Amino acid sequence: SGESLEIDFTGSASQTPGFINSSIPNTYSYIFLTLSSMIDDSIPRNEGLFRPVEVKLPQGSVVNPNPPAPCTACTLHAGGEIGEAVAFALEKAIPKMAYVQNVKLGMPVVTYGTNPYTGEFYVDQNVMMSAGWCNAAYGVDGWGALPPFFGAMTMATGELHDMNFPVLTMGREFITDSGGPGKWRGGLGTSTKIKALAPMFAHTYVIGTKYPMRGFSGGMDGSTNRVVLREGTAGEQVVEKTAFESPLSSGDITLA
């Protein structure tokens, strides 16, 4: 109201034993990142913008946890959801500036083991198995998950990936109708299949299996996420939340 803005997270969930609690600096960063990206371009992004904003963060909540709460993944989650909540609140006043301030990413399926071609230990953080950014905005369709990762990390090709690790990339493609329907369609998700060519172990955590990327300003939600280890075998594992040191044999397929 007037020349001030109150952002109140009262009612947020309590802090969690998991590693997605958001520290105060992370929470503030997402609040002001969202605010800065949605207001008029003529307004300088400096201390004068931040000073009239009052932020209320309940102590002991997921947005302001008591130490020593784990916060390792808060850069994405619950950080992304914090940005999303602020964007939804501002959407009512400036709908044309609203867009998805979130990434339903979790983490890539990270594998590690001994490369039989070199005899050396390796860790493969495969960002090809990540999707969920470059979403729709006013006047623009989402453009999917093939651009650089957050605009900061260029994705390697499947061929380059296969040259460096004991795997075979069997395919990577957009999933039809996975973007949220609307006047401007949301960004499409991808389906990636990678076959292990040697024994290895996999780590991952998955989000967006229940709550997908949300639509804005009348747009509909996108599709949910799915990660499958050892697809099509008796030991097939659909990852519900996390997978830790999950063994993959030569020939096993990972789908994400």
Please report, for each region that a protein language model flagged, where it lies by residue.
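Glycine/proline-enriched, intrinsically flexible loops and inter-domain linkers
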Residues: 1-256
